[in-house]
Regions:
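Short hydrophobic alpha-helices and adjacent helix-cap/hinge residues
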Residues: 3-5, 24-226
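Bacterial N-terminal signal peptides
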Residues: 10-21
């Protein structure tokens, strides 16, 4: 069984536990399970996650309707618009249409969700995101001048956000230790990322720890102000 299948089945177990417990109190008009995806559902990873979830959910006896919303996030310069896209999606699912559960796939959708001033009191499961994140910039900010602040998702759990799922956790210090162990003559280490939300979030994580790593600071390349 692939790691993805283990992940899907674990998430499904949580979903069914939550949904069935809600049915004890819900009416016949229980709301849907809402999946919010950063990307077009036709992309390979997104398709695999959603398809396997749907198969396992039905196989496990799930009967609640599942609704998929796509934010269609593309390049980083669009980041100031993502907050509004997420707000528009959440506004569609209120009152009698309130979801029993929200599943968020992708870092852009996740960043858009935690950037909301108001978050519905609904359990959230997430996938395809990392433990380190950055809040989205204001709509009037030039993204090229953006200096994002690192945040740890654990902070939101500590504040009472009903959150579960799998997170990617990057141990920069351990990676540096491994590099120096395998290549002891190494004098300089550079982090090179693409100019995406994930790349910028990784840069922010590394900058947060710069000066704490044994040896020289890392050179960071990838985000250029224009």
């Amino acid at each position: 069984m692939t790691l993805l299948k283990y992940y899907i089945r674990f998430v499904l177990f949580i979903v069914l536990s939550l949904v069935f417990s809600f049915h004890l109190y819900a009416t016949d008009n229980a709301g849907p399970i809402l999946i919010i995806s950063s990307y077009n559902p036709d992309t390979r990873n997104t398709t695999a996650n959603i398809s396997e979830f749907m198969e396992e959910y039905k196989r496990g006896g799930g009967i609640s309707p599942v609704v998929i919303e796509n934010m269609n996030c593309k390049s980083l310069p669009e980041a100031p618009l993502w907050d509004g896209k997420m707000r528009g999606i959440l506004d569609k699912y209120k009152e009698n249409n309130t979801p029993q559960l929200i599943i968020i796939l992708g870092q852009e959708a996740w960043a858009s969700y935690i950037s909301q001033e108001y978050k519905p009191n609904i359990p959230v499961l997430c996938g395809m995101i990392s433990k380190n994140a950055i809040l989205l910039p204001d709509s009037d900010l030039n993204v090229a001048e953006w200096e994002p602040k690192y945040i740890d998702i654990q902070e939101y759990v500590d504040k009472g956000l009903h959150l579960g799922g799998f997170l990617y956790s990057y141990d920069v210090k351990e990676n540096i230790r491994l590099i120096r162990k395998l290549y002891p003559q190494t004098q300089n280490i550079a982090l090179i990322t693409d100019n995406t939300y994930g790349g910028l979030a990784m840069q922010t994580l590394v900058k947060k720890g710069n000066g704490k790593y044994q040896g020289s600071e890392l050179d960071i390349t990838g985000w250029k102000k224009e």
